């Protein structure tokens, strides 16, 4: 099947609530791409607006840790989005296969994901649905954040595309302020990332209950249990910093750039800062000898 006279669909990759994603070939440039098609039965006004928003959002972003978007348009009464093809798997797939990760791998993923979010936040874009399924790892293990379908431009409240009081996002990773129906901001993304990193290390997110509503109450009211108390072998520094990401108040969480810098350094290892190199102080010059007392005058 040839979309828009250019993109030849090869095989289906996945299907979500709004559309289906295909592996395809761009026959003009001769490269592999991913093509997302809006499903016809879901092409109502709201879904169409969200699909357009994803394209507009991605067009404002260019960063190694964000899935790039190359093209957008309409074809046979369906909208399509052409994206970078990430040859790899999502963190959700990785967790299914591996259950939990070690601190070093989790720190690398956290640092790269935070760097991608920092780029989005600098453009005034909040993702609003950070979860393992939206964090991809390419063949080299590099993080790529995808699916900006419910993103929000913080300078354009009309871009929320949700009815009043309707919460969008995934309950396991939803920030407390979002659970209370407040507007998402950059700090909300950081809380969600904290939930993901917690799950990478433990195998379970910090909060999980029998119902989505009960889980939301936990995000609002229940302090997260430190990982070290749950038997996870991480440094005290890592554990404490992660609890900061999971702070109940948005203003108490670090920014995306701060998180990226922290995890891309060695602070998460919990090692003491090295002392500055020792340079012996130069020897003090000897004091000059006191001048001899003058000889007494004759007859004095």
What are these regions (language model features)?
Residues 76-90, 94, 98:
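Conserved short submotifs of the Hanks-type protein kinase catalytic core
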Residues 72:
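Activation-segment/catalytic-loop signature of the eukaryotic protein kinase fold
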Residues 109-110:
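Activation segment signature within eukaryotic-like protein kinase domains
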Residues 37-60:
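AlphaC helix of the eukaryotic protein kinase fold
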Residues 9-16, 21:
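Protein kinase glycine-rich loop
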Residues 43-46, 139-183:
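Activation segment of protein kinases
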Residues 113-125:
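Protein kinase catalytic-loop region centered on the HRD/HxD motif
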């Amino acid at each position: 099947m040839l979309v828009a006279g250019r993109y030849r669909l090869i095989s289906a990759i996945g299907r979500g609530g709004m559309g289906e994603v295909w592996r395809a070939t761009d026959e003009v440039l001769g490269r592999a791409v991913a093509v997302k098609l809006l499903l016809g039965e879901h092409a109502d006004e709201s879904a169409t607006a969200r699909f357009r928003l994803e394209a507009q959002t991605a067009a404002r972003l260019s960063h190694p840790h964000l899935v790039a978007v190359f093209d957008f348009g309409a074809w046979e009464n369906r909208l399509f989005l052409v994206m970078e093809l990430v040859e790899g798997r999502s963190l959700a797939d990785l967790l299914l296969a591996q259950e939990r990760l070690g601190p070093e791998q989790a720190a690398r993923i956290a640092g790269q994901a935070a760097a991608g979010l920092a780029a989005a936040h600098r453009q005034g874009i909040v993702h609003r649905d950070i979860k393992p399924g939206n964090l991809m790892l390419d063949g080299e293990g590099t993080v790529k954040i995808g699916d900006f379908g419910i993103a929000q431009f913080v300078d354009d409240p009309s871009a929320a595309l949700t009815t009043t009081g309707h919460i969008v996002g995934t309950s396991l990773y939803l920030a407390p302020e979002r659970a209370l129906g407040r507007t998402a901001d950059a700090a909300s993304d950081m809380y969600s990332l904290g939930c993901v990193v917690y799950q990478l290390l433990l195998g379970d997110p910090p909060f999980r209950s029998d119902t989505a509503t009960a889980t939301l109450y936990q995000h609002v009211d229940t302090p997260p249990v430190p990982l070290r108390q749950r038997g996870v072998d991480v440094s005290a520094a890592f554990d404490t910093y992660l609890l900061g990401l999971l702070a109940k108040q948005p203003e108490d969480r670090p920014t995306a750039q701060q998180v990226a810098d922290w995890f891309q350094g060695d602070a998460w290892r919990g090692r003491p800062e090295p002392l500055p190199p020792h340079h012996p102080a130069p020897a003090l010059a000897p004091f000059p000898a006191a001048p001899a007392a003058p000889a007494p005058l004759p007859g004095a």
